[in-house]
Amino acid sequence: WNFDNAGFVFSTKLGNVTTLRYVNFGFNYHKAKSFNKTTTMEGQLGLSQTELMAAQANGMFYDGIDLAYYTEKGINPYDDKGNAGWLGALGWDAELFYTDDHPTLPFYPYVTNPYANYRSEERGGVDQYDFNIAFNFNDRVYFGITIGAYDVNYRKTYYYGEDISNDGEYYDLWSDNRIHGAGWDAKFGLILRPLEESPLRLGLAIHTPTFYKLTYTTEAEIGADLWYVDNETGEEFMDYHSYSTYYKLGDKKMNREFELRTPWTYNLSLGYTVGHNLALGAEYEYQNYSSMKFYYPEGDKMEYESSQVKNNTKGVSTFRIGAEYKVIPEFAFRLGYNYSSAAFEKNAVKALSTNSLNVDTDYANTKSLSNYTLGIGYRGSSFYADLAYKYTSQKADFYPFALPTETGTYDTPAVTKVTNSRSQVVFTLGMRF
């Protein structure tokens, strides 16, 4: 059970003959997004995450950051001065890739086809608080403005491990990631009744981008159990060793502040009432996700992150249709359908920069989303209640990582097809005073 919505509207009637008939003031809270999800997978991959560790280390090397030199000089790769990618640095510390005897690459892995285990837990959500004012002109023109405030709280715990040989060698990678902060936006809406004698309604709405100020907090740890050879005796032995960014940073987590600007939203709607019993409605909405931008706190654009969004996402069209039929004036049945196209390009990948703090390499390219709703409502003189069933379905292509190649493309393990479905029962109560 969740209490995800609450609000009120205060209506002021100014007169029956004045141009401005009503002014309404409202407030509404609702859970705009829930991140709660747990995912587990395992299997033979054909590729190893250690290849991605080595690839990031090579990228750092060509950018002037040599992990072998850092080790020799005692330079901490995990702090701000080190400016190294954590995935490559942890893999290097855990000795999961080599640095010599290769003809072309500074670093290269020795694992190619491990058995992998993956688990992630995501928790939190986005709470939205809307403050609005609306105007009714001659019962034919309706205009409203809404200022929205957002509170973001997201947490992801990530675990990934590989059995890298038949002799018991393995490694485990873990990270804890949090994003918290706040944002705001503005919404402008207009509804017109173009013909006084007709129940036809036309609507237009524009939503500004949401301007977020966020803080990313992370820590990571790797542990590996590997076979070694004693140089003096020649005997083989297995040794477990682990490395933690929390320890390397002096018992601290790493914090990064950034800003996010979401796309503009454009909405068109159409409504019509047939007689006194049947109401029909339809909407079309568009958001271009490739226009999202990331910024540093100082205001400069984060070029790499913004370019990745531009290359991997696209515009999303959303269609909504609904109908309400009043059996008697107090009771009504409702049906609704909502379709949103996919936000990701077909071959979208998660590509980490050479200095990325992220070690959670997994990603899922979600497909189109469908919502189906069925409900019943009661309207009394001072009390109303609504009961609705909502079913949501969305497919996704899941990958544990994407490995860059020398040609500029990406290799991935075989795709895992995922279907996310959710059923909800929503009950709403309201009072009129």
Q: At which residue positions do the language-model features occur?
A:
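Outer-membrane beta-barrel porins/channels
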Residues: 4, 9-433
